[in-house]
């Protein structure tokens, strides 16, 4: 089979961050009866489902460590590698850090897909690493039934500038740096519903580096930050709210959306991960239409940064975002938790 005829998405049962194990099932997997190992230098572990682990070196600098990998979300091998690498590197930026090195994770069905195609995937990953200013320094590969690619990434951050997903405050405004709808558009493409004018839009967004995260970390008023990926905006916002003991009020009209996303939802281009996300987080939502639910639960691959920002820092955040070509509008706010109210409400 020629490389031109290859459609990588046909060789996997899932796609991108939509491959994630559902939060409910993950809770069961991570539950342990063993005594927890306590290390006072481990600033961020898995307690709040943050984007990466952070370890204090004791000299004012902390190490950030993360890994992320998945099955193809696009058919083009180079783009798949680039998207997977960009997505993995994003975790470093989401913690406020700068990446310094990456190693590759490759699973490949050697008897089904040519090694030349795997090389193209790896080249896409190398390209993304170069964009981030780091080396793809090594990696590990296995013969696997489905194609898998991703990175383990190491970064650094001044300890006082670490941004967590659990330290938001009531009164903070919420901002999102990329539009939602990646899962919807990629599903529409698989179903041959995608219009010509929307071809390539999702890929362009997924390949956009969240490098602004390191700059946002220098703003004191950025109280919490995370990237929106496989659990959708609802899932990652819920984790932010749970960690801080606050509730969120969202303005649906102000949430950035990819062109055509509402039309494709109406046509049924909703990925399976959307329902898994709703099953895990739907009980935290207020009343909303199926269309709104489908967008908020849409699994994002290499999605944008979600920021909780104090009102006095709003102008600084917008100005910093503009330096990276990002036009920010508040999508909602955080309020004090109150009984009888949903954790996430839509206005």
Curated annotation (Swiss-Prot):
Gene Ontology CC entries for this record: cytoplasm
Key word Ion transport present: no
GO biological-process terms attached to the record: selenocysteine biosynthetic process
Signal peptide annotation: none
Coiled-coil intervals, chain numbering: none
Site, Important for catalytic activity: residue positions: 20
Catalytic activity: hydrogenselenide + ATP + H2O = selenophosphate + AMP + phosphate + 2 H(+)
Binding-site residues, ATP: 20, 48-50, 68, 91, 139-141
GO function terms (MF aspect): ATP binding; magnesium ion binding; selenide, water dikinase activity
Active site: 17
Annotated positions binding Mg(2+): 51, 91, 227
Role summary: Synthesizes selenophosphate from selenide and ATP.
Assembly, per entry: Homodimer.
Protein family: Belongs to the selenophosphate synthase 1 family. Class I subfamily.
Protein name from the UniProt record: Selenide, water dikinase
Organism expressing this protein natively: Salmonella typhimurium (strain LT2 / SGSC1412 / ATCC 700720)
């Amino acid at each position: 089979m020629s490389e031109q005829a290859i459609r990588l998405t046909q060789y996997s049962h899932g796609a991108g961050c939509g491959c994630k194990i559902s939060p409910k099932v993950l809770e069961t997997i991570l539950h342990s009866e063993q005594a927890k190992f306590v290390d006072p230098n481990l600033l961020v572990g898995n307690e709040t489902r943050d984007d990466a682990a952070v370890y204090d070196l004791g000299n004012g600098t902390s190490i950030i460590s993360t890994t992320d990998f998945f099955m193809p979300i696009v058919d083009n091998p180079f783009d798949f590698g680039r998207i997977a690498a960009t997505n993995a590197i994003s975790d470093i930026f989401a913690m406020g850090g700068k990446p310094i090195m990456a190693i590759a994770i490759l699973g490949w069905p050697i008897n089904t897909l040519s090694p030349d195609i795997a090389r193209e995937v790896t080249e896409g990953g190398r390209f993304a690493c170069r964009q981030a200013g780091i080396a793809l320094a090594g990696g590990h590969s296995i013969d696997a039934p489905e194609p898998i690619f991703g990175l383990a990434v190491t970064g650094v951050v001044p300890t006082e500038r670490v941004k967590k997903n659990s330290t938001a405050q009531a009164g903070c405004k919420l901002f999102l740096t990329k539009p939602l709808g990646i899962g919807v558009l990629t599903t529409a493409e698989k179903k041959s519903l995608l219009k010509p004018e929307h071809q390539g839009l999702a890929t362009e967004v997924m390949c956009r580096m969240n490098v602004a995260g390191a700059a946002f970390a220098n703003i004191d008023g950025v109280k919490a930050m995370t990237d929106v990926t496989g659990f959708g905006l609802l899932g990652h916002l819920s984790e932010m709210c749970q960690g801080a003991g606050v509730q969120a009020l969202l303005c649906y009209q102000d949430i950035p959306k990819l062109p055509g996303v509402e039309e494709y939802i109406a046509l049924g281009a909703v990925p399976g991960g959307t329902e898994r996300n709703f099953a895990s987080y739907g009980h935290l939502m207020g009343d909303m239409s199926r269309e709104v639910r489908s967008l908020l639960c849409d699994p994002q691959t290499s999605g944008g940064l979600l920021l909780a920002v104090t009102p006095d820092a709003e102008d600084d955040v917008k100005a910093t975002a503009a330096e990276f070509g990002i036009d920010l509008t508040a999508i909602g706010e955080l309020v004090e938790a109150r009984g009888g109210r949903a954790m996430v409400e839509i206005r």
